[in-house]
Amino acid sequence: MITREEETELVRHIEDLPFKPFDFHGHLANRQVVGFGRRYEYDRREVVEAAPIPDFLLPLRDKVAIFAERFAAEFAQVLVNEYRPGAGIGWHRDKPQFELVAGVSLLAPCNFRLRRRNGGAWDRETIEVEPRSAYLMAGPARNEWEHSIPPVNRHRYSVTFRTLRSNL
């Protein structure tokens, strides 16, 4: 998706962002986040305005849009996640207000786990997401499967881009 040089430049800017621990109804997660464009307000259960997407993220959004075969402006939400060693994210499905979810991994790989209920059991898949690579969740991968990232061994960032669902 991007070159090492582009990754280095992105990380240089990302390191200066005002990260805060992810707050889920008062529970502080072990990863840190900063969001732009739009953000999901958990207490109000709605998408609200956030700070504008910084200029340094716009070229990456353009590349993600080409990858997803969408217009760049459709990716109205950007969430930058910082995972220090030992940090991960539990099983979840992104909020229904968002449609497509695309992510770009920076600095270190991670195991991106997927699961969906199949009767009384779970179908499971694991994808190793390499640094500088991208993934796209759409259709069943977005709407039927949950995903998680187990605790990482090395410091990494992910930049997640989301489109808004038009029928909500």
Where in the sequence are the language-model features?
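Non-heme Fe(II) oxygenase metal-center motifs and adjacent flexible, charged/small-residue loops
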Residues: M1-L168
